[in-house]
């Protein structure tokens, strides 16, 4: 339903009005998948920030109308794989009055690895207070060839571990 949302050629989704729609897409290995998108409120401006953006002036980000950021806490299953700008970005975003969530980039290829990734994420968070959820970024190409049930179990394992630690 293009009245609710549209998808551009890069795969970015743009909410247009309140309502629900189903978005279908083809995965890298030519499988078809879909999800239901519900637009239930006004849109907010939010940035995804990691080491790839270099130094970020969060006061300028705030002045540009962004009230939310999702910071990459890290990637993979080792405690040493914390994003090297995470601590600075977290402190500077909070100091600028920007609400913070985090994501963990997954390199997992099995449901059991997802537990290790969640624990590495929790280690990097070290009890930090978040304003938004912890997101599990599942776009690692080798994992996408897993069965749907294993892929789903991987997400459930990560999310349940994060939730048990008190995060959303």
Q: Where would I find each of the regions flagged by the language model?
A:
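Extracytoplasmic soluble-region selector
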Residues: 1-41
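Substrate-binding cleft of extracellular glycoside hydrolase catalytic domains
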Residues: 44-159, 163-165
